[in-house]
Amino acid sequence: MITESREHLQSKPQNSESIIRLDTPDDRPSLECDSLPSGGHSSKVSGGPASIEGKDVKNVSELETCATKAQTPHDEVPISTSKIIAVVGGLVLAVFCMSLDSTILSTAIPNIVSQFHSQNEMGWYVSAYSLTLASFSLAFGKIYTFYSTKTVFLITLSLFEAGSLICGAAPNSLALIIGRAIAGIGGTGMYLGALLLVAEILPFDKIPITTALLGAMYGIAAVVGPLLGGAFTDYATWRWCFYINLPMGGLTFLFVFFFVKRGKDKKRTREANNIVARFLELDPIGVALMIPTLVCLLLALEWGGATYSWHSWRLIVLYVVGGCCALGFVGVQIWRQDTATIPPRLLKNRNILGIILFSFCLNGSFVVLAYYLPIWFQSIKGVTAIKSGIMNLPLILTMIICSMICSTLVTKLGYYTPFLYLAPIIASTGAGLLSTMHVNSGSPVWIGFQALFGIGLGCGGTLSIVAAQTALPPEDISTGTAIVTFTQTLAAAVFNFVAQNVFQNQVLSGLAQSAPGVSAAKLTKAGPTMLREVVPADTLPAVLEVYNTAITRAFYVSVGGAALAIFGSIPLQWLSVKDRKTQAVTAHA
């Protein structure tokens, strides 16, 4: 808060020496500002409520100039345009690799199982990666809060590369699972670091379009992953599903290492006088409770009703352990307050609460369609897995194009809130129309409905990260970004679980009524692409109707998620990315 009015400031003599100081809590950074336009007088600036000493300030804009420099440490070390392009290109490659690892194994797993004779372990080839990807996201948010973004990013990139190398060279199933877990830990830190590096090296009004570019990698990987996995498996070896990460990750490492200057560790950590004190800054108790909480939750969602009964002792153990750890985690966060993994004060920020709800619902809505649309194409239209990926392109391409357009508009206009209002309205309409599809729906129907949902998703999918970063002061950006990315990952697990239960229950009840002679277990084992091979011709139409109904009922989950996302948009303030630096100063007033 500036303690003198504009009129009073302008009434000061313009030739006198002055000092401008923005006072802050002890753990906030400060710097000397000696480049005021009014005669080059020396000033001291630190972020926080302002007081003014001396006799000369030409106008308030001079104060804002100093404040801007204090609040944007990355502006102190400018990077050339060519280096920025190289670094952003490297970050895009890294995020693409991380996203690719979530989808590329879908067509390679049968060959891996055949080579390792590991039918009972194949579920862990996917789960080991997704579990660690979700479980460590908040922990890395805490680490990035205290340590150099460049340093932590390079470490997590190295972890991801090491995990990929272990997977590619795995002599047995256990080694592959361990490699996948290591890659997941590195991947979540690498993705978060990419978002934070973008926020550090770019002007804030250029961040939306770059974030959209990173987010587009998820959509591209969803389509390209199965195609690459199938190509590597058929024409080379499944091991190249992992080796492909090494050259791309290596290029990213070189760009970031040489072109991004290492920032200083945060002040609070620098003041810690020993290793133990630094370690305690990272909330180790909270992290130790959070990780088993998430692992228990995700395992329960994955195993429940599919691998084990909901009442089995394994699931009960997960409920008890997960519940106790969750209660302990909440207690630790309340106790540690500002040094917690999730500082409670952030959850009092209406923008953050809104973005959490918005991201959870909209991303969950997308995940359901991304999973069940290919099943609809394979089972109802009888196409191959690769062809179903191509038929899914209308959603992915419109999402990418609309995301880039909206991000460009945000860069020009400054405001992102209107797009976050539009996103759930358009997306829920598109998902609702997809839920009306039937067995004989033609290409104009499924292309148009997918495109409509893709437009809605593109309007708001990546802007949620930008909204969180705009609404938070610089010292909270890493934590806020981690919360949003964690929310998106958790949404994928929760919404898939709900949709899977809707789908399975509808298939069971539908077969019992329309095709009682067909075994649901037999259909599940065969998979959607083999539906016509295992079902007698005389009962195939009835089974297709059952499958179509089950899939479109699962789409209802997507409709509900997209519609609920509007309640996350409503609390958002109208903040501009163009005023981000000034808002960072006044946010503490």
Swiss-Prot record:
It is found in: Membrane. Residues 1-10 have a biased composition (Basic and acidic residues). GO terms for cellular component: plasma membrane. Its main location: membrane. Residues 1-54 are annotated as: Disordered. Glycans are attached at residue 59. InterPro entries: MFS, MFS_dom, MFS_trans_sf. The keyword Transmembrane applies. It is a multi-pass membrane protein. One of its GO terms (molecular function) is transmembrane transporter activity. The chain crosses the membrane at residues 84-104, 121-141, 151-171, 182-202, 212-232, 240-260, 285-305, 315-335, 352-372, 390-410, 419-439, 445-465, 479-499, 555-575. Keywords: Glycoprotein, Membrane, Transmembrane, Transmembrane helix, Transport. MFS-type transporter; part of the gene cluster that mediates the biosynthesis of paraherquonin, a meroterpenoid with a unique, highly congested hexacyclic molecular architecture. Belongs to the major facilitator superfamily. TCR/Tet family. This is MFS-type transporter prhG. The lineage of its organism: Eukaryota, Fungi, Dikarya, Ascomycota, Pezizomycotina.
